[in-house]
Amino acid sequence: MPKVITLPGDGIGPEVTAAAVQVLREVAPDVTVEEHAIGGGAYDAHGEPFPTSTRDALKEADAVLLGTVGGAHDSAWNQLPRHLRPESGLLALRKALGCYANLRPVRVQPGLEHLSPLKAELARGVDILIVRELLGGIYFDQDRKIEGDTAYNTMRYTTSEVERVAKVAFWAAEQRKGRVTSVDKANVLEVSELWRRDVQALRDRDYRSIHLNHEYVDSVAMLIVADPSRYDVILTENLFGDILSDLAAVIPGSLGLMPSASLGDGAGLFEPIHGSAPDIAGQGVANPAAAIMSVGMLLRHGLERSEAANQVDRAVALALREQPTRDLGGSADTQTFTRAVLKALGSSPSVG
């Protein structure tokens, strides 16, 4: 049986993860779910934010479902040495899983166009998947230093790094509309010249059915808000992807509607992109939609169960229309929204 490791974490993480697990059990009752610790709570219990017991459990996982990590700015956790802070546990988790491709869907749900800061006619029907390279580029290269009044970082990519993340983008496009926009700055950066060359060569060799075009990152930063429907799958490197994915995250109108997946050669990591929201933790009012949509991504990309993933996506869309949560202008709390999703899936609306 497939095994999913859950890491509820801190703040509202346990609440939204519990909701997500109920949905997972409904659509995939054969999956074994096992909970482990991460983040600030893990430090309190084990003396480290990414305990050995959690690290060992990942070896048997088919997928990992993460809640949220971290506390308030003035929390005692933030006074710890950096390597013991909750966020260090998250970085160690991603490194342990070897996740090199981050998938960030940007979808405006039908009937919720009014939440977007864009005009309704621009927001309507937006459905973008941003595929970001996660382990290379300027963030990870060790050729970096501050020397007096001079500092430098190095952006470096190899063909193998480019190809492995491009394969994820092309594979995703095959499940969608068959269009990939590769984003670079090849007019001024040699590393982007390599990126463009290798992405094009891979497409021409193995993915000839995919329509590929190349755009500069500054152009995409403008067009993703001026004409977002022009995009299907966006593929880009680490730095550009970090910026573009956060820019695009405002389009749906709430971080509570933003799931994500990080994929590598082993178990994938699936998580909502919102923070731990310690100000509302324990009140039962957190929006679990992103965590539940992360289950949809887990089913699709982690367990290869596309039909179950589609069922979750449809149920969430219906629940958002019928029982919007407080951050979306409605009144539903965590349990009420979860009941609505389970009802849409044909389940008993009972929620513990």
From Swiss-Prot:
Mg(2+) binds at residues 218, 242, 246. One of its GO terms (biological process) is L-leucine biosynthetic process. The keyword Amino-acid biosynthesis applies. The record marks 139, 185 as: Important for catalysis. Binds 1 Mg(2+) or Mn(2+) ion per subunit. GO terms for molecular function: 3-isopropylmalate dehydrogenase activity; magnesium ion binding; NAD binding. Signal peptide: none annotated. Pathway: Amino-acid biosynthesis; L-leucine biosynthesis; L-leucine from 3-methyl-2-oxobutanoate: step 3/4. It is found in: Cytoplasm. It catalyses: (2R,3S)-3-isopropylmalate + NAD(+) = 4-methyl-2-oxopentanoate + CO2 + NADH. NAD(+) binds at residues 71-87, 275-287. GO terms for cellular component: cytosol. Its EC number is 1.1.1.85. InterPro entries: IsoCit/isopropylmalate_DH_CS, IsoPropMal-DH-like_dom, Isopropylmalate_DH. Its cofactor is Mg(2+); Mn(2+). It holds the Pfam family Iso_dh. Substrate binds at residues 94, 104, 132, 218. Keywords: Amino-acid biosynthesis, Branched-chain amino acid biosynthesis, Cytoplasm, Leucine biosynthesis, Magnesium, Manganese, Metal-binding, NAD, Oxidoreductase. Belongs to the isocitrate and isopropylmalate dehydrogenases family. LeuB type 1 subfamily. Catalyzes the oxidation of 3-carboxy-2-hydroxy-4-methylpentanoate (3-isopropylmalate) to 3-carboxy-4-methyl-2-oxopentanoate. The product decarboxylates to 4-methyl-2 oxopentanoate. Homodimer. PANTHER family: 3-ISOPROPYLMALATE DEHYDROGENASE. This is 3-isopropylmalate dehydrogenase. It comes from Deinococcus radiodurans (strain ATCC 13939 / DSM 20539 / JCM 16871 / CCUG 27074 / LMG 4051 / NBRC 15346 / NCIMB 9279 / VKM B-1422 / R1).
